[in-house]
């Protein structure tokens, strides 16, 4: 039997993730595989903010097209980049155990967010992060920061930015110290993106190895990530909207925290819901309803103007 082909983006972090799945496939599923690098729309267009490029699946669409053609057998994604609605015939075969879900502040000069001078320039790719930064510091100048992790760090070190915000999971996976000052925000300080810290493996549901990859699935992480994805789906949102959502389990209880707002931090809804694990999806719907009643759809319409 030939090797399975893993589709992956070409960045160092994406290849770390693909190799992580490759090793686990061999060790736990006894399946040999090889990696094929694929350039996505998000990789090709680096001179514009992600929300200006338009469309959903900026980092997944080309990989999904190759899955549907049968050119690759599976695609490894950062789960936060995976659209909540799949192309017909595709689905997640597994969601891996979550790494650190937090966002991290990095600076060469300033120890934390509150020590930044007035009007400081902060780099981030994410409207979600911009919105939450502006909630804390309206004066900050949040600017688009594109490129891989190393490119972003070089922009910080060259003085282009006073600080940047990156995902802690990516820094840990690449074993990067980052900068002189590095401080992770708590989930309460900055609510992460849906699925942040987890990897999603996408395949054709009809693929003969689809079920076998369930061995790589982490039940608790998958449960929480599906709750988060359900919330985003209810907003009819994609990966580039200013929404943070995080679900966590505490024994037989679940807590879901969410925030949505304009990128300038002017109109923001923040709520949380706690409930029984066995009624967790009902809790998501109740939280979603509370957001919609508070004007979530109207805010998302205004986001298009930014």
Curated annotation (Swiss-Prot):
Keywords noted in UniProt: Porphyrin biosynthesis, Transferase
A Gene Ontology biological process term: protoporphyrinogen IX biosynthetic process
Pathway the protein contributes to: Porphyrin-containing compound metabolism; protoporphyrin-IX biosynthesis; coproporphyrinogen-III from 5-aminolevulinate: step 2/4
Record GO terms (molecular function): hydroxymethylbilane synthase activity
Leading EC class: transferase
Transmembrane segment boundaries: none
EC numbers for this chain: 2.5.1.61
Recorded GO CC terms: cytoplasm
InterPro entries from the UniProt entry: HemC, Porphobilin_deaminase_cofac_BS, Porphobilin_deaminase_N, Porphobilinogen_deaminase_C, Porphobilinogen_deaminase_C_sf
Keyword Transferase: yes
Enzymatic reactions: 4 porphobilinogen + H2O = hydroxymethylbilane + 4 NH4(+)
Cofactor annotation: dipyrromethane
Location of S-(dipyrrolylmethanemethyl)cysteine modifications: 239
Record's function text: Tetrapolymerization of the monopyrrole PBG into the hydroxymethylbilane pre-uroporphyrinogen in several discrete steps.
Additional detail: The porphobilinogen subunits are added to the dipyrromethane group.
Subunit structure: Monomer.
Family to which this protein belongs: Belongs to the HMBS family.
Protein name (Swiss-Prot/TrEMBL): Porphobilinogen deaminase
Organism, as annotated: Helicobacter acinonychis (strain Sheeba)
């Amino acid at each position: 039997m030939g090797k399975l082909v893993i589709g992956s983006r070409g960045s160092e972090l994406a290849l770390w993730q693909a190799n992580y799945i490759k090793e686990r496939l061999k060790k736990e599923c006894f399946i040999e595989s090889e990696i094929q690098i694929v350039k996505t729309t998000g990789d090709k267009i680096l001179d514009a903010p992600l929300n200006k490029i338009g469309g959903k699946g900026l980092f997944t669409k080309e990989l999904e097209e190759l899955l549907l053609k049968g050119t690759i057998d599976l695609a490894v994604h950062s789960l936060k980049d995976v659209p909540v609605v799949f192309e017909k015939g595709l689905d997640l075969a597994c969601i891996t155990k979550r790494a650190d879900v937090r966002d991290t502040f990095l600076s060469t000069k300033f120890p934390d967010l509150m020590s930044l001078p007035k009007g400081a320039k902060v780099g981030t790719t994410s409207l979600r992060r911009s919105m939450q930064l502006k909630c804390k510091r309206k004066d900050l100048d949040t600017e688009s920061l594109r490129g891989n992790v190393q490119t972003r760090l070089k922009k910080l070190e060259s003085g282009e930015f006073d600080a940047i915000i990156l995902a802690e999971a990516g820094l840990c996976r690449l074993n990067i110290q980052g900068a002189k000052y590095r401080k992770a925000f708590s989930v309460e300080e900055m609510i992460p993106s849906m699925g942040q810290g987890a990897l999603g493996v996408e395949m054709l549901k009809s693929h003969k190895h689809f079920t076998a990859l369930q061995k790589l699935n982490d039940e608790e992480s998958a449960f929480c990530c599906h709750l988060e994805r359900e919330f985003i789906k209810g907003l009819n949102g994609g990966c580039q909207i200013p929404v943070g959502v995080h679900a966590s389990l505490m024994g037989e209880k679940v807590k879901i925290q969410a925030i949505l707002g304009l990128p300038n931090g002017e109109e923001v809804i923040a709520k949380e819901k706690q409930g029984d694990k066995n009624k967790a999806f009902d809790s998501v719907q109740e939280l979603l309803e509370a957001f919609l009643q508070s004007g979530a759809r109207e805010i998302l319409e205004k986001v298009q103007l930014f």
